Amino acid sequence: MQLFQNILVSIALLTQIVFAIEITENKVDRGTVTLNLSDITIYPGASWSIIDNAYTSFVGKLDVRDGAGLYISSTSHLLALQVSLTALLHSITNNGVVSFDSRISRTSSSYDLRGVSFTNNGEMYFAASGEFSSPTALTSASWTNTGLLSFYQNQRTSGTVSLGMPLGSITNTGQVCLNNQVYEQTTQIKGSGCFTANGDSTIYISNVLLAVSPKQNFYLTDKGSSMIVQAVSTTQTFNVYGFGEGNKIGLTIPLMGNLWNSAYAYDTTSGILTLRNLLLEQKFNIGTGYDPSKFQVVTDSGSGIPSTILGSVAYYGRVPERTLPKSCQIPCKPIPEAPGTTPTQYTTTITKTNTAGNTVTESGVVNVSTDKGGSWFTTTSMFPALSTAPSTATVFSSDTIMSTVEPDTTELASLTDIPIETSSVEELLSVMSNWEISSAPTLSIETPVSSHHSSMQHSSFESSADINTVFSSESAFETASDYIVSTPSSISHSTMVPQSSVSALSVVSESLASAEPSFVVPSESFIFSASSAAPQPSSSTYSVSFTTQFETPSSAGPSLVTSVESNTELISSATQSSDIQTEFTSTWTTTNSDGSVVTESGIISQSGTSLTTLTTFQPATSLVVPPYSVIETEFTSTWTTTNSDSSVATESGVVSQSDTLLTTVTTFPPAPSAIVPEFTSPWKINTSIESSETLTVSASSYETVGESLAAATSSYLSSATVVVAPSESEINTSSSILNNEEIASAPVSDTTSIAEHHDGSLSMTTTEFVNSNSLPSSHSIVTATITSCNKSKCSESVVTYVSSVSCATITVGDSEKNISTVGNNVSSIVGDDVSNTQAITMATSTEGATTLTSVSGAKPSVANDATNSVHTTDYTTATTGVQNGSSLSIPSDIPIEISVITPTNSSSSAITIPYENGSNKESIENIKYLALVVFGLMMFM
């Protein structure tokens, strides 16, 4: 008995050795493939793709190494895959990629892999269309998954996925992805892996008596996914992630509460959801953060599972945030594309020996595609075979006339010997049919097309023969691995005409022996044409010319002609060619004289072993710009300029460029700079009157108070606006005081200059001349806020004036009492252009106070009449009264733009207070004192 077992084991081992299949490089098989009793091993870096093999049965073990791949796929709508491994004594081990893909088929597919063990450490994909039930079973006794298992259907059917031997156990520490599939548990589940339900998928725990590890995880990713657990007395707790958005968790029987508990309960503290039917219950750890009001009892009626009415619970709300286990974070990848499932084209090369004993290399293009029914077919187009036998040259001992041409980018090896032995056309034509060319042409990749024209003319008194030989060279490289690219070498083209009545044409390549090509592109074709009259055996004159023409437009090679004549007889040998002519397109590359590589294509004519370039296509994409073409562009630029004062300024704008000519189109205005250079700017002060109303200030009555006169005044005012424009740098004014038509003070003339500083501020320098004495002073132009109050209402206005103090505020109040000004006399100011003295009037009126606005630069015309009235055509500026004969009081500040009194029709008594902000002539204390006086007078009256 032991001997018999040893014999069986030996036979089995020998069988495995004999029939083992080892894949060490990429391989594609289409159609029926017989695996026999073979162990299959696919090594790293290699793949085996089996396409449209309806039944694939693995009899031996299957071992896919790391970095290797096994692909079994269907490309036919009518052909579904049936893949099985039925040898119970063999194993399946995958460390690479295994893919079974039958998604395109409209019939039922089946995947049934059995064996003594199943181990997946890589990626395995099982895909079906799902139009019919397509079961998948991986039912090995020893079952382990640490990688990715993906079960995919285009749509869900009643087919299920079974893992492991029923009633056995599986160990899952990886990821099991379900897409429109149903996983039915029939074993114990060990490990800390993950089952992920995508799309319309269901995880069905059909036998709770077989324990599921508490570390195993179940992930519901879509609203259509669900989980169903058998309801038995044995209660387990399942880790569920992604519960929400309407997906379901349920039991195999309807949910029903009892006297103590409801049909379902959620513990917000522990995150446990309990589903029960009377006394049977199962628990699900869904996590915390759920709203108990959003749970609802529903029915899960998916295919492939027991349809239980009101046996599940759905949560109609967002899934609370919860960290996924690492195994659930392994992505569910899409089904990979199998090599060779799309139409393809490749080249092939065959080397053989012909009947003459010469080595012949054939090359062709293989097209693999499918017909309308999805069936694969292959077409092969072979190029003609060329001999690689070395060529020999004929050496003439007689005197010869030599002409040599050495092109730079052409490498052509051919040998043609034409001995001249006859002078008749008939003999010439008969000899032409026996021409042989012993050559091994080698074409450099640098020159795709070169043609050589050789003409021989036979002429006599009444007979003539024209023989034209044209042979061209072209390359049609499909892939670099199929062709040998020779290096350039020196080529000598020799035309030899011996004096001993023998003429020969030979083209010799010095690098032919060293090239040793394994494949030579068909490169020569000969076209002969002959015409003759009646032949006569008289002596003839032959003209032999050799022409090298470079037909590629990008080639810079010359066109050289070498011609010799001799009174000799012609004997020639010609090549034999096939009568079958074909045309096809091809692509080649050339190298120009400047080293650039150009790709060209065209139509090639093939007659036997002869190839001729008929047409060269124009480049599909080429842009040739003339070297001196003028292109006009516009762009933004920045530049620096040097002013006449040697200062450098930076400017920017739009520049137009035409060839090398630059033209400034637009100059942008300079941006405001943080640093403004200090300079003196001219200003012009204009005065415009907004009202045509005449301003009058009159002295209506007088009374003696001691030695003084008291005057009551009435004011009729109109507003004015000052416009300041940079036109004059100096403002000249003059003024004097008249009393009873006599000058009360010396004439005063002013010269005022305004300057703008780098910080944006303005300043004014004033020089006053009193009796030819200059009194210069410098002031700053500042802004003050004037607050005007009328009864209980107040308003503010901003005025600009000249002062040595940066800012000041004065408040004008109102009163119901009239005031009188006491003085020796009412003095006034006259002047041509008075702008150096101004006052702010504090008025009292029973109807309201005056309002301050902005004005400056008045030109009053003042005169005293018999009633001592003061008249003006513009408006009157009142100042502090001075005694007769006293000098003009010169204010310290020269207002440029200060308050103006808005016209009012009421009669009022006013006291004028010169408003000189920062002046040492009138202090704030004096203003307060006068305000108290005014208040006292108001109380007195």
From Swiss-Prot:
Propeptide residues per the UniProt entry: 918-941
Principal subcellular localisation of the protein: secreted
Lipid moiety-binding region (GPI-anchor amidated asparagine): 917
Annotated signal sequence range: 1-20
Protein name: Cell wall protein IFF9
Compartments where located: Secreted, Cell wall; Membrane
Record note on modification: The GPI-anchor is attached to the protein in the endoplasmic reticulum and serves to target the protein to the cell surface. There, the glucosamine-inositol phospholipid moiety is cleaved off and the GPI-modified mannoprotein is covalently attached via its lipidless GPI glycan remnant to the 1,6-beta-glucan of the outer cell wall layer.
Signals that turn on the gene: Induced in low iron conditions.
Family (UniProt): Belongs to the HYR1/IFF family.
Role description: GPI-anchored cell wall protein involved in cell wall organization, hyphal growth, as well as in host-fungal interaction and virulence.
InterPro entries, per database record: Cell_wall_rpt, Hyphal-reg_cell_wall_N
Keywords of the record: Cell wall, Glycoprotein, GPI-anchor, Lipoprotein, Membrane, Secreted, Signal, Virulence
Membrane topology term: Lipid-anchor; GPI-anchor
Gene Ontology CC terms: cell surface; extracellular region; fungal-type cell wall; side of membrane
